């Protein structure tokens, strides 16, 4: 046999080409993980650390049977408390709590996947999670490999017990670890907005929290001892100035939904409408197994969800705030628009909005709603009825905490 000898330079070039090809392959694999705001369910708002294999299986079943999966809800995310209080003493790996998950997590995740859903886990950038379980600090690459080996599709990464840590560096390290693990995993930065993640997180993850935690009240701040949580409208007030940072694959996250957790039906509608207008991730946080027909009708309103999931990916903007009625506009594909009129007060308010007298311009994206030269048809997305055109004013009464949400089409 005659052996052919190749110059060392040729071999080096071949190896370099192979390496670059492999890197490009993985880079392509991790692109476009969240072209629209992620939709799913998270365990924390209702269950905190009281989670189990039985709960996960039950939620997965209801996500399908209730129509939520069909409406676009994809991710089932286990929040804090899924792991044991100590890592494996030999390997250093995280260990699923054997009481909550006696069969481990892999069978549970496989079951979620069998339902056509995706699975998410939680951890923290600090030494411990917010509930005192093992954090990821110093274990980023090991934990990322562990998540990938289980088939995890989504990671929520919190910010407790992080004294002395630089936020950008910590989240960048975890982002690199997830990419190196060889599996596409949506990365949710739960940094509470403390270090302005909207300024640096676009190349790091697909969504980032803009505020502290939400709580199930419509407005104001609720104290929980040494920390506090924000009502729906309090969080909304913090979002308008951040819209330029949102877009496909990089979303502002005003926190999970509290629909079905004690808000009134009107407040549920307003909450869901505003999250849709904000192009916010729609992550439900109620007990899906026990939700009322009213809650289900809000969470699965496909017309409202379509506003949130519009492929243009533009976060809406607050147009006006008059007499307790906030007006929000959101540009959509095909030169269509969505508008929300939200009554923030505890008394009914009269709305009189004359399209011919208003100048609706989105300066950030150079878009305008010209109702003088173009007639738009109006559809009420909650009553699911056509309600006229922009040739005539909108005159109606908006009940306390309720919303009028319209889609404008030519």
Task: Give the residues covered by each predicted segment.
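N-terminal module-boundary/linker segments of secreted carbohydrate-active enzymes
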Residues: 28-53, 57, 62
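Structural recognition of the beta-strand scaffold that forms the well-ordered cores
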Residues: 33, 37-43, 72-79, 118-123, ...
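C-terminal beta-strand-rich structural cap/linker in extracellular carbohydrate-active enzymes
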Residues: 388-410
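Aromatic-lined carbohydrate-binding/catalytic grooves of carbohydrate-active enzymes
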Residues: 59, 63-164
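Catalytic cores of secreted or luminal carbohydrate-active enzymes
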Residues: 269-319
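Bacterial Sec-dependent N-terminal signal peptides
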Residues: 1-29
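Glycan-recognition surfaces
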Residues: 186-287
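Carbohydrate-binding surface patches
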Residues: 275-278, 283-285, 321-365
